[in-house]
Amino acid sequence: MQKFFMLSAALLLSFAAAHATVRTEAGTSESAAGKSETYRLNVPVEKDMATTQIRLVIPAGVGISRFQVTPGFARTVTKDADGLVTEVVWKGDIEPMEYARFFFQAVNPVQPGELVWKVYQTYADGSVVAWDDTQPDKTPASHTTVK
């Protein structure tokens, strides 16, 4: 019975973790204020069809400096009037039962606080899953604590 409980708990945790996440390269959700950090966006496919586009909204105060090339994906960047990156879109295919990682370097805000990374995942049928905290229990955004 205990093995069943542990297996069930592990399975539930894996489902809870199966969403688009932004973490530091070391895999944490914490970083230092003003620090240059390498972040990774991890995007799993949760449907029986390919993901065709990923849109990442950059939190205010984060300064993106460069991206790692992601084979099979074209990247477009939107900047504000000051030249700061506000949004990144990657287009390509992530097939069912696959995931993709997108790495980028950024400088954290100098003030401590909470970064909310909003991710919009588009599937081949045009449907979009909004990992943006509009439904935190179902589609949570990724958060980074800047200390």
Which residue stretches match the model-derived regions?
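Short, solvent-exposed loop/turn segments enriched in Ser/Thr/Gly
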Residues: G34-Y39, A100-R101, E114-W117
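Bacterial N-terminal signal peptides that target proteins for export
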Residues: M1-M6
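Hydrophobic h-region of N-terminal signal peptides that target proteins for export
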Residues: A10-A18
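Low-complexity, intrinsically disordered segments enriched in Ser/Thr together with acidic residues
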Residues: D93-G113
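Serine/threonine-enriched low-complexity regions used as flexible
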Residues: G113-S127
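A surface/secretory-pathway sequence property marking extracellular, secreted
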Residues: A60-T86, D133
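Extracytoplasmic/periplasmic copper-protein system
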Residues: A20-S29, D125-K147
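Low-complexity, serine/threonine/proline/glycine-rich extracellular segments that form mucin-like
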Residues: G27-F67
